[in-house]
Amino acid sequence: MEMKPKYDPREVEAGRYEEWVKNGYFKPSEDKSKETYTIVIPPPNVTGKLHLGHAWDTTLQDIITRMKRMQGYDTLYLPGMDHAGIATQAKVEAKLNEQGITRYDLGREKFLEQAWDWKEEYASFIRAQWAKLGLGLDYSRERFTLDEGLSKAVKKVFVDLYNKGIIYRGERIINWDPKARTALSDIEVIHEDVQGAFYHFKYPYADGEGFIEIATTRPETMLGDTAIVVNPNDERYKDVIGKTVILPIVGRELPILADEYVDIDFGSGAMKVTPAHDPNDFEIGQRHQLENIIVMDENGKMNDKAGKYEGMDRFDCRKQLVKDLKEQDLVIKIEDHFHSVGHSERSGAVVEPYLSTQWFVRMEDLAKRSLDNQKTDDRIDFYPQRFEHTFNQWMENIRDWTISRQLWWGHQIPAWYHKETGEIYVGEEAPTDIENWQQDEDVLDTWFSSALWPFSTLGWPDLESEDFKRYYPTNALVTGYDIIFFWVARMIFQGLEFTDRRPFNDVLLHGLVRAEDGRKMSKSLGNGVDPMDVIDEYGADSLRYFLATGSSPGHDLRYSTEKVESVWNFINKIWNGARFSLMNIGEDFKVEDIDLSGNLSLADKWILTRLNETIATVTDLSDKYEFGEVGRALYNFIWDDFCDWYIEMSKIPMNSNDEEQKQVTRSVLSYTLDNIMRMLHPFMPFVTEKIWQSLPHEGDTIVKASWPEVRESLIFEESKQTMQQLVEIIKSVRQSRVEVNTPLSKEIPILIQAKDKEIETTLSQNKDYLIKFCNPSTLNISTDVEIPEKAMTSVVIAGKVVLPLEGLIDMDKEISRLEKELAKLQSELDRVDKKLSNENFVSKAPEKVINEEKRKKQDYQEKYDGVKARIEQLKA
């Protein structure tokens, strides 16, 4: 198969994925004696196209499953997508708004048709992106969180938890999103520090004798106040407990009550109680049987309980209310106050604590079981392990989960209310006399169905499902650390509750993809990167390798075009190395021609030893998910050892007349390159398939080739040490040539003073390598080499490498040249020092610019020290 002179990812990747899918290479094995390995894809939302975070996520999953397939496992990498209730509904509503239509204009049924159309459109985009990334998914098993099978699972779980008393319906303070008009769970609320105000008001005593000072950050809620509370141990208020105050504006009389919840040292020590608009106030209200007065509607506008402010937006009401209180001389002071305010993770709206009747999951027992399970043999291993502590902490402090959402797109709650009696019926099927019942209009939190993903996608609740019996529990979950609470924790407690087993063995957590400057990627900053654009420019293999090897587990990844380009250069290096190897191997060379039992050269033994070391390292690190370290091991072996050294060394026998030695070299080239392709394949599936198909091979595809194994018979420690000595000598000679400004093309005398006779013999036996790579006019290897007075000497493991300088360079001229270079470097150092000592520059310049100047200083200093040392050496 022809390989073009330059690596072209478009040509390499064209049609390859379709061929893999068509031939069923990603389907599980038919050999049921094999051990299974399963990963279910974290389902991307059908809200839009995939971003770099998705690309990172799925690349890691694909690397793991491809590797496990090659290691002989029966692998299943199961695809699917999430309906993403609130996010998708918002997108569809925005699209309708462009046409001047609301969801209420359409009605529920027609709106859901629009949502399904949206889903189909974006699902096709997502599949196309999966294909471009090269993901080895079994599309015959693709699932969607609203498909029939998953809907059945959701209903069963809801009904079972309801019957156990774990799911309940109750009136509680919930997080209300007035923009999306739905309840939110605690972890869907993002807390942001904002500049606000602390308002101090007078609440006059009903008897006309003075006032009590009350402070609040949300004046609009005072319209729903039903009491004032003070700490019973607060001496300031002991005499007023039992008295009443008049609620400003409204005129309602409020009792002053004693409650130990109040912090004596905070504010005035007196606190207003608004049970319908604050979770702590609600608890106080329950203790004192206070009335719950809701003063806002679901849109965040003031309702009829707000009196003259009815119909006003809550924030407009705040301004007007403060203005009115000032006019009545009831404002004591207004202080600037920097505080944390909850915002909707989806809509960005300021979240309103709001009294509402919702459905909840009682979390105490579910959380305890998850925590207890981590102390058993069925525990889940977290990578990095520190995230287990994060998981445990959250589970230990968990609150009940609000699961109802005031949306249309999602799993409608399987609860019905009798039209006459109000009786509640919860069941997997609708009541038989459906005409007498009204189904709850709310849907379930998206994460409720996502929490069942590892087992619902495999056929549960059908316990006899072949997929469920064979592929559950799954082996690894790969996802971002930002959804440990949203998703990972919930899958764990639901998996334990409904299957009595952990849903996955390992959890591999990665960070966020950030812009090059470390900032979060976002539309508003305009610094987002479309992974498909990167693939169009550099190829899927370049992007995959960068994503997989660019950081360590649990850490964020800074996207860098320069680094992706450097991966492209690495692949191009591999490509060129493969082209050279294939040209020398020849088209007639077959797998059966590979013979490594012949007369292996030192270079052959060395590269085979390094190959086996790399196989062992890559396998071990991959099992620990240390793909960053894997990347370094592969890069060092392929770029340095194979391409830069072995390929060059192989030219010695290939350019000789020794046919037997040529055949041995062909075998080593073929064997080594084949193993390199198989090690690289999970990371770079496209280019490795292309090169592997050109190599002598067995089988139809590298996808199903076996993972490389260490062969003890091909490890030659002594040869490795000898080659290390030779390489060190060659590097020393080349560095010395640079330092005395003598090109490699010019022959020079080289002396090697061997440390002992054994080394002298070894180096003499392998002097062909030194001659090829050092280009000596004469080469003298001996233990008793006489070192000339004027010479450049380097100490190496094998002894000393000496370059006689007499006649090689004009000493005075070279010293003069170096002194001029030293002066230039001193000038640059002075310039950078002046800049970095300038307080004005340091205080105003961006951190990136300052760091760049520091880097320059370090570079100049290293060069300065090197040039100065060379001058001193020449003068000596």
From Swiss-Prot:
Q: Name one GO cellular component term.
A: cytosol
What NCBIfam families would the database entry show?
PRK05729.1 (NF004349), valS (TIGR00422)
Notes concerning its domains: ValRS has two distinct active sites: one for aminoacylation and one for editing. The misactivated threonine is translocated from the active site to the editing site. The C-terminal coiled-coil domain is crucial for aminoacylation activity.
Q: Where is this motif: 'HIGH' region?
A: 44-54
Q: Which GO terms describe its biological process?
A: valyl-tRNA aminoacylation
Q: Which species does the entry assign this protein to? A: Staphylococcus aureus (strain Mu3 / ATCC 700698)
Q: Where's it found, cell-wise? A: Cytoplasm
Which molecular function terms from Gene Ontology are attached? aminoacyl-tRNA deacylase activity; ATP binding; valine-tRNA ligase activity
> What is the stated purpose of this protein?
Catalyzes the attachment of valine to tRNA(Val). As ValRS can inadvertently accommodate and process structurally similar amino acids such as threonine, to avoid such errors, it has a 'posttransfer' editing activity that hydrolyzes mischarged Thr-tRNA(Val) in a tRNA-dependent manner.
Family per record: Belongs to the class-I aminoacyl-tRNA synthetase family. ValS type 1 subfamily.
The name under which this protein is listed is Valine--tRNA ligase
Motif 'KMSKS' region per record, residues: 520-524
The answer to whether keyword Cell membrane applies is: no
**What are the entry keywords?**
Aminoacyl-tRNA synthetase, ATP-binding, Coiled coil, Cytoplasm, Ligase, Nucleotide-binding, Protein biosynthesis
> What's the EC number here?
6.1.1.9
The record's section on PANTHER family has: VALINE--TRNA LIGASE, CHLOROPLASTIC_MITOCHONDRIAL 2, VALYL-TRNA SYNTHETASES
Q: Kindly state the subunit structure of this protein.
A: Monomer.
